[in-house]
Amino acid sequence: MLQKKLKFWYDKKQGVFPCFLSFRKHPGPSGRERLTYALGRVVKERNTHDRQPGSRLFGKMKILKTEERKRDRMAENREMTIEICCGSYEDALAAARGGAERIELNSALALGGLTPSAACLRMVKRCTDLLVVSMVRPRGAGFCYTEAQTEQMFEEARELMENGSDGLAFGFLTEDRCVDLEKTGRMTELIHSYGREAVFHRAFDCTEDPVRAIEELIGLGADRILTSGQQEKAEQGKELLRQLQAAYGSRIQLLAGSGVNAGNARALAEYTGIRQLHSSCRYWERDVTTVGEGVNYSIAPAPHERDYDRVSERLVRELAEAFRER
């Protein structure tokens, strides 16, 4: 590996401070070389295909964290971690203030969570220190996608990672409710080519055989699975969660979610042995313009037909405190 450093001074509105520009050249995936350079706490990476006679040099830039910081935060993920399901920039701010380490960033939570905008992701990364796992999901309902929908997902995946997402949550199933090995393998490989985490979301809970599914995901190199133990709520699925953690917890991260709150987090973690919990920490906010004369834009039934859901900073803090009392 070749490394060069150049010290210089950088002028910001807040003042002048010393920093360095470093260059690293080392082997990358698929026989490519990877050139990285770092300025302060921001790292940019350029992947270049090997030159062939008469070929052009292709490359792309993407914003990354420093390698040391990333290693530190990835180590934290293997410890006790609270992940908050967020549907907006505002939700992410509440999660950060409440003490969350990581969020799953979505849009359209009323549909189970769809792909967030790149603008929302950039705002979260700019204004918080949260690890962000971005949802990649083009529509509501299930997880068996057409070719056009799949193409959209891969395009969105690249955009999200190029805008700083620390990982992606996704799920591909076949019509017989098995993991789609081809699409899942391609997505996992793409995510890992950016050095990010590949998270298979609760599509796992719709699979016909969870043992077969988790073994296939391990074989494909997935980093983590979000699951409720194939039940509506994680408490109801705690037996399967416990079994999966005991059998596979050393080979893949398990993240327990659905119905997790301050009242049950500690008991759920102790019973299952799972050290990562996923929660919405939701409360309802009224928007009186939701229902008009003959028009109704409600996303929830009564008594919340004029409400939308938000992340509660208080509930996040209570969850974090309860979980860390273990």
What residue spans do the PLM features occupy?
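C-terminal alpha-helical cap/extension of soluble enzyme domains
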Residues: 140, 248-326
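Glycine/small-residue-rich loop that forms an oxyanion/phosphate-binding "nest" at active or ligand-binding sites
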Residues: 124, 130-184
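Active-site-adjacent beta->alpha loops and helix N-cap segments on the catalytic face
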Residues: 90, 109-128, 174-191, 207-212, ...
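Hydrophobic faces of well-ordered beta-strands that scaffold small-molecule active sites
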Residues: 80-84, 103-105, 132-136, 168-170, ...
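Glycine-enriched alpha-helix->loop->beta-strand junction motifs that scaffold or abut catalytic
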Residues: 98-103, 128-130, 164-167, 193-195, ...
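Glycine-rich phosphate-binding active-site loops on the catalytic face of alpha/beta enzymes
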Residues: 104-113, 159, 163, 169-175, ...
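Active-site mouth loops of central-metabolism enzymes
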Residues: 76-87, 137-152, 173, 199-209
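Catalytic cores of alpha/beta
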Residues: 90-94, 145-156, 208-219, 260-275, ...
